[in-house]
């Protein structure tokens, strides 16, 4: 799984996710499923915001090539990907400027067009189950929830999918491709099933001769690493390097 992640995700995303996990004592070489999940969530958040701008009339526009006009403003503020202190600073600034209700938990994005925070979810399970879990945790009608699955399904608050169909299709296609590539490498079952993941982890550690002295456990809690990615990448260019193109999985 680790090799798959390094081959199939943008190197910047891999580096951010790896550093985030290590800062919380999580080893990407051991908790490889979590490593893959963090990278996937990051990529979806970036893809969600990619190419979407607001013009001088306040209208949402899509620009996919070249540098956007100076009069255009990014439609989405990316909160996911920043360290917690900076993320809360951004949230507080948004709330002070827009008078939006401050969320109890760090959201992933802020939508300047709809004036609302957005929580992005990527699930290996049924979308409605994951949606309800998110909604129960957030407990706020002010934060918009949008869930994607690896099977092409999606679910959003009040069936408001925010993005145009083509933009959402781009995300769904990427997730489906990730699933297919995992399956072709025999990784999908362990990625979906905690029991299979634990069995695979034991097998991998044994094959590496690293079982001695190591606890054989797989954490299923939401990783705090998802919220502590290094803010140094979030400069005024708004992760321009990520907007160029995402690496495609190499063929077997």
Curated annotation (Swiss-Prot):
Question: Which Gene3D superfamilies does the annotation name?
Answer: Influenza RNA-dependent RNA polymerase subunit PA, endonuclease domain
Q: Where are the transmembrane segments?
A: none
- Record's keyword terms, sorted: Decay of host mRNAs by virus, Eukaryotic host gene expression shutoff by virus, Host cytoplasm, Host gene expression shutoff by virus, Host mRNA suppression by virus, Host nucleus, Host-virus interaction
InterPro entries (alphabetical): PA/PA-X (IPR001009), PA/PA-X_sf (IPR038372)
Q: Where in the cell is it found?
A: Host cytoplasm; Host nucleus
Q: Which residues form the active site?
A: 80, 108
Listed name of the protein: Protein PA-X
Taxonomic lineage is:
Viruses, Riboviria, Orthornavirae, Negarnaviricota, Polyploviricotina
- The protein's gene is named PA
């Amino acid at each position: 799984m680790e090799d798959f992640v390094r081959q199939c995700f943008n190197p910047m995303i891999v580096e951010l996710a790896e550093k985030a996990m290590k800062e919380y004592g999580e080893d990407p070489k051991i908790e490889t499923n979590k490593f893959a999940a963090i990278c996937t969530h990051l990529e979806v958040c970036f893809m969600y915001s990619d190419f979407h701008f607001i013009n001088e009339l306040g209208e949402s526009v899509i620009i996919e090539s070249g540098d956007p006009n100076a009069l255009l403003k990014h439609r989405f503020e990316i909160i996911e990907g920043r360290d917690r202190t900076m993320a809360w600073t951004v949230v507080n600034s948004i709330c002070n400027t827009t008078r939006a209700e401050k969320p109890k938990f760090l959201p992933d994005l802020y939508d300047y067009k709809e004036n609302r925070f957005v929580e992005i979810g990527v699930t290996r399970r049924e979308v409605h189950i994951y949606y309800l879990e998110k909604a129960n945790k957030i407990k706020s009608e002010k934060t918009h929830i949008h869930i994607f699955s690896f099977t092409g399904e999606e679910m959003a608050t009040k069936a408001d999918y925010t993005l145009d169909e083509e933009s959402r299709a781009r995300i769904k296609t990427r997730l489906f491709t990730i699933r297919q590539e995992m399956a072709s490498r025999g990784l999908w079952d362990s990625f979906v099933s905690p029991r299979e993941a634990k069995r695979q982890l034991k097998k991998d550690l044994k094959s590496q001769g690293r079982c001695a002295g190591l606890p054989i456990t797989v954490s299923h809690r939401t990783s705090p690493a998802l919220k502590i990615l290094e803010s140094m990448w979030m400069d005024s260019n708004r992760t321009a390097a990520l907007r160029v193109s995402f690496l495609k999985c190499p063929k077997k």
